[in-house]
Regions:
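Conserved alpha-helix/loop element of class I SAM-dependent methyltransferases that forms part
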Residues: 29-49, 65
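Class I SAM-dependent methyltransferase Rossmann-like catalytic core
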Residues: 2-36
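Class I SAM-dependent methyltransferase SAM/SAH-binding core
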Residues: 51-107
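A short SAM/SAH-binding and catalytic strip from SAM-dependent methyltransferases
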Residues: 116-129
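A short acidic, Gly/Pro-enriched loop at the edge of an enzyme's catalytic core
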Residues: 106-117
């Protein structure tokens, strides 16, 4: 399945999130909330992870939480944006096992069956080809490894479809089918509803641009203000 984000090249996405790196942490409420929820889902797991990838790590908040949860593991912060990785690097303490790797999620520079956990918070809307990304995840996962991910669904931000990238958000059934095609077994998917109230429409747009969900304020909105 090719997502609408395929209209943006990897370079386009890299540049967008390079720009957003400076403002991401002030505009990342959704990203932060889904990250926390995804970590909660991992609490019942009782495996010793030696190698973990935070795939699409953004500014590295999730990476640091993973390194605290799995203290013996080598955690890699993987993102297409060099500026996001620089921000992630500044978070880590001295002598940290965390390493930063700049890479496209559809072309991972890791050996087959070398990773215990792939953690991907809000990555899937930004991959050009869902199947290729899931195939790569399955390739690098060890037997009995875990792929934990969160993504927005097609009904997300439905009030703002005229200017948001909601067409990027994969349907849960498409993701489930993709996981099976990639060779992953026993996929478990569920849906959470997150309701957010912004102080103003301007603040909403500022957050969308600030976290990279939008490249810039929509031109038609600017035109209406003038």
């Amino acid at each position: 399945m090719r997502l609408k984000s395929g209209e943006l090249s990897v370079g386009d996405i890299q540049r967008r999130f390079d720009r957003a790196a400076a403002t991401f942490d002030e505009s990342d409420y959704v990203h932060r909330t889904t990250c926390t929820g995804l970590l909660e889902r991992l609490k019942p797991t009782t495996f010793d992870a030696a190698v973990i990838i935070d795939l699409g790590s953004a500014s590295g908040k999730g990476t640091m939480l993973l390194s605290k949860k799995y203290r013996k593991a080598r955690v890699m912060s993987v993102d297409v944006s060099a500026e996001m990785l620089r921000k992630s690097s500044r978070r880590k303490p001295l002598l940290s096992k965390v390493r930063e790797v700049q890479a496209d999620a559809c072309r991972l520079p890791f050996l087959d069956h070398s990773v215990d956990l792939v953690f991907a918070n809000m990555l899937l809307p930004w991959v050009a080809t869902l199947d290729q990304c899931l195939n790569e995840v399955n390739r690098v996962l060890r037997k009995d490894g875990i792929f934990a991910f969160a993504t927005l669904g097609p009904d997300s931000m439905s009030e703002f479809t005229s200017f948001t990238d909601s067409q990027r958000y994969p349907d849960m059934h498409d993701v489930g089918d993709g996981l099976v095609r990639a060779g992953m077994t026993d996929p478990v998917l569920d849906v959470d509803r997150l309701q957010i109230t912004w102080k103003s429409f301007d603040k909403l747009l500022d957050d969308f641009v600030g976290c990279g969900a939008l490249g810039e304020w929509p031109s038609d909105v600017r035109a209406e203000e003038q």
